[in-house]
Every structure is written in C-alpha cells, then in structure tokens.
Curated annotation (Swiss-Prot):
GO terms for cellular component: cytoplasm. Pathway: Cofactor biosynthesis; NAD(+) biosynthesis; NAD(+) from deamido-NAD(+) (ammonia route): step 1/1. It comes from Lactococcus lactis subsp. lactis (strain IL1403) (Streptococcus lactis). One of its GO terms (biological process) is NAD biosynthetic process. This is NH(3)-dependent NAD(+) synthetase. It comes from the Bacteria.
Length: 274
C-alpha cells in the first residue's frame, strides 16, 4: 500500500460522491450524537463567511430543525457566532453566509480585546509575539469563545476540518483544530462545494478564495499560496488520482510534518511520531 493509499484510507475520502447522500450522512451523524447524549441541546460554530463554516453551519441547522420536529423539544438550537478581530474586511461574506445558514441564534463576539490583552501580557513578560504566533492566538481565542458559548447553551462545538485541510494540517492546533464533532470530515474541497451547490448556496460562498486570514502582515493570504500547492491537486490526490511529482511531494511532506496535529497529546504509548 502506498502512502497515498494509506492517507486516503485514514481520511475516508470517496473518489465520487452523491451530494444528497453526503448531506444526509452529515445531518444524521449530528442527530445521532444528540440522541446519544440528550443533555446536549445545541451545536455551536464560528462563522467566517467561507465555504467550510457555511457548509457545516447549514448542515447543523438542518439537523437541529429535524430534531425539534422529531422530538417536539424546542430547546434544541444552533448557535452561529461571528468572531471578528476588530473590523473584518470580509464582513459582507460573513453576512451572506448567515443569510444562507439561517441560524436559530446569531451572536457576534469581537476577539480583538482578548487577543491584544494576551499579547500585551506576553510583552510584559519579555516575549515579543511574532505576527504568525499572534495569528494562532486569534484562532485559539475564537475556540475559547465558542466553548464558553457552548457551556452556556448546553452545547457541543462543531469543527470545519475536512480532508483537504486535514491532509496538510492547515489548521491551528487547539484553535480551529479543536472541536467536538467534525461533520465535514471525509469530504475534500471540491466535494464540499458540491454539497453547498446542492443546498442552494449563493455561488459566491463556495467560489470565494480560501484564506485563514490570521496574519496582519499578510492579510487575506490565500491558502494555496501558503501551502504551495493547489486545492485541485490536493483533491485529486485524496481521490486517488495521479498528480505531478512536485505536488505529490509537497502534500506528503505536509502530511508527515503535521502528524502531531491529528493526534491527542503524545504519551509514552504512542509511536506514530518516531
């Protein structure tokens, strides 16, 4: 078995999907969790305005609505949270996403004060925080906020991790990589687009250039530039297709370099890192 085969098996990506079937798989997955743990009454998710949070958010809202219909329990809610750092340049995209998702509850929590407070405290301790490191603080502050909201709403936090993101480790450890459930896991980028199209999303949502937008010195830096490889190549790779040796080498290098992000904290019983 090649490394590509091993990765595809671990990620669970199918070479061809039926968008309607995959929508049902994700919705049922979320509902099954609520049925298993009846004390959980909400799903919480940060909404950026990009493809991934738009898709996960809409799937969560559908699951919650079906749970209310099936159980007659009106306490089930989906909570969408806008988590801007100051004034976000793509706020229009976020509002477009919220209009598509139609969440039960929509909150906005500006993380700038919390992030700047943390950076100031580190500066006082003699630590000069780099722009890249500060970007990770932003991602982790967003997850702190989501868990705080989930605690108030008896909720579980959803993540937006999917195959194209997971394979490259393109997420912040214990930031956007921290969540309770991952409804998009097994789907690559183009498959996520197909689900959004099936759900009737505005094409602007899934045609938007993907960006983490965490670094102030590189605002709106496209994921593909940061990774040095295109999502088209990543998607082809996860579907078992042949891609250029250069792209393949980059993808597999990212996979190996970021293995620690795909595991719980390492103990003496773990050997994946050796």
């Amino acid at each position: 078995m090649t490394l590509q085969d091993e990765i595809i098996k671990e990620l669970g990506v199918k070479p061809v999907i039926d968008p309607k079937e995959e929508i049902r798989v994700s919705v049922d997955f979320l509902k099954d969790y609520l049925k298993k743990y009846p004390f959980i009454k909400s799903f919480v998710l940060g909404i950026s305005g990009g493809q991934d949070s738009s898709l996960a958010g809409r799937l969560a809202q559908i699951a919650i609505e079906e749970m209310r219909q099936e159980t007659a329990d009106e306490t089930y809610k989906f909570v969408a949270i806008r988590l801007p750092y100051g004034v976000q340049a793509d706020e229009e995209d976020a509002q477009r996403a919220l209009a598509f998702i139609q969440p039960d509850v929509s909150l906005t929590v500006n993380i700038k004060a919390a992030v700047e407070g943390q950076v100031a405290a580190l500066n006082e301790a003699g630590i000069e925080v780099s722009d890249f490191n500060k970007g990770n603080i932003k991602a982790r502050q967003r997850m702190i906020t989501q868990y705080a909201v989930a605690g108030q709403y008896q909720g579980a936090v959803l993540g937006t991790d999917h195959a194209a993101e997971n394979i490259t480790g393109f997420f912040t450890k214990f930031g956007d990589g921290g969540a309770d459930l991952l409804p998009l896991f097994r789907l690559n980028k183009r498959q996520g687009k197909a689900l959004l199209a099936e759900l009737g999303a505005d094409p602007a949502i899934y045609e938007k250039v993907p960006t983490a937008d965490l670094e102030e010195g590189k605002p709106g830096l496209a994921d593909e530039i940061a990774l040095g490889v295109t999502y088209n190549d990543i998607d082809d790779y996860t579907e078992g297709k042949v891609i250029s040796e250069d792209a393949k080498a980059k993808i597999e290098a990212w996979w190996k370099k970021t293995q620690h992000k795909r595991h719980l904290p390492i103990s003496v019983f773990d050997d994946f890192w050796k």
